């Protein structure tokens, strides 16, 4: 089916999904390669502490994927979850500057848990919610 053959409402939804996935993957690809560098150079974490942060992110991603999958299945229409993830993506930079970085410098475990929860929700559940 061609884009021009879609009903106006379907075209509108298609454009929203297209924009969501474009910005989601853009932010993900811009953040991920530089995240270990940011942890080491800006937050002065050791390689072991960086490993703890990455392990926490992976753990919470594994935990949240089925939870968001069930929520997505029960809601049927996934717009609410997409908007939630969109808001979390918009708050990405303020979270890193004002929450994640100070927590990592004060307590590596607390920072890893909070960062793992946030990043696990935003970057690991969005593809499943949107598909």
From Swiss-Prot:
Residues 35-50, 102 are periplasmic. It comes from the Bacteria. The chain crosses the membrane at residues 14-34, 51-71, 81-101, 103-123. It is found in: Cell inner membrane. Gene3D superfamilies: MFS general substrate transporter like domains (1.20.1250.20). GO terms for molecular function: lactose binding; lactose:proton symporter activity. One of its GO terms (cellular component) is plasma membrane. Responsible for transport of beta-galactosides into the cell, with the concomitant import of a proton (symport system). This is Lactose permease. It comes from Klebsiella pneumoniae. The lineage of its organism: Bacteria, Pseudomonadati, Pseudomonadota, Gammaproteobacteria, Enterobacterales.
